[in-house]
Design a protein with these regions (language model features):
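Glycine-rich active-site loop/strand segments that organize a redox cofactor
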Residues: 15-17, 25, 31, 47-51
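Short, glycine/charged-enriched secondary-structure capping and boundary segments
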Residues: 25-28, 42, 129-133, 149-151, ...
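Conserved N-terminal helical subregion
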Residues: 33-146
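A structural signal for short hydrophobic beta-strand segments in well-ordered beta-sheet cores
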Residues: 1, 59, 105, 172-173
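Glycine-rich FAD pyrophosphate-binding loop
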Residues: 2-24
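Glycine-rich loop(s) and the adjacent beta-strand/alpha-helix scaffold that form part
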Residues: 143-155, 164
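Conserved FAD/dinucleotide-binding core of flavoprotein oxidoreductases
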Residues: 71, 77, 155-208
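Short strand-connecting beta-turns/loops that link adjacent beta-strands
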Residues: 6, 90, 152, 175-178
């Protein structure tokens, strides 16, 4: 918006701190990257300094392997992506209010011509206006754990194992030169069969 109208008055509210993030890496397809490049060349170039690229998706099912080529993807650290966006906001003189919830929708509508909300899956705005938006929530019962590792994969990897408890799977991908994202997922019944529910009460800080 600032590129189109440098005089536009824009304010950003961010409920988290500048370095807060949830998860480790974020993936972009070639198509998505083309859209980012067309929208903001500067952001695209800044992101590209941190990218890990790959073209293959490798699938391992109980030790049987096959690769699917022709997939263009890139990934980067979620924290570094936040830094890129924060730098761009600063370049354009856009104030970002960290650790601050946005004002109520009624107040925003009274003072701004355009409101863009990005609140995630538990969006209060989407819930408040679900009849207007026509949105519904359909909860599922899979369990997953989002981890990071210093093992650097060469491609996007799927690992699927039929265990005595049921099917468990992992998808993992490099996010920079030194680390990868590693996500473990399974049905809730499998999770309970394996005894993971016994650790429900334990809480670890992000990154530990």
């Amino acid at each position: 918006i600032k590129q189109i109208d440098p005089q536009a008055d824009i304010t950003v509210w961010e409920r988290n701190a500048p370095d807060d993030t949830f998860g480790f890496g974020v993936v972009f397809s070639d198509q998505t990257l083309s859209g980012i490049k067309a929208s903001d060349q500067s952001v695209f170039e800044d992101m590209g300094k941190s990218f890990a690229y790959w073209g293959d998706v490798d699938v391992d099912i109980d030790g049987s392997n096959f690769a699917i080529g022709g997939n263009g993807f890139a990934a980067m650290s979620r924290k570094e992506l936040l830094h890129v966006l924060q730098r761009r906001a600063k370049d354009h003189g856009v104030p970002v209010h960290f650790n601050t919830e946005a004002p109520p929708v009624s107040e925003l509508m009274a003072n701004y011509d355009l409101v863009l909300a990005s609140e995630g899956i538990n969006s209060a705005i989407r819930s408040e206006f679900e009849s207007d938006f026509g949105t519904t929530v359909d909860p599922r019962k899979c369990k997953f754990m989002w981890l990071g590792t210093d093992l650097v994969f060469e491609a996007f990897e799927f690992f699927i194992r039929n265990t005595e408890y049921g099917v468990m799977q992992v998808h993992a991908y490099p996010m920079d030169e030194k680390s990868s994202t590693f996500i473990i997922e399974m049905n809730e019944d499998v999770w309970r069969n394996a005894g993971f529910d016994k650790f429900e009460s334990e809480s670890l800080p992000p990154g530990v």
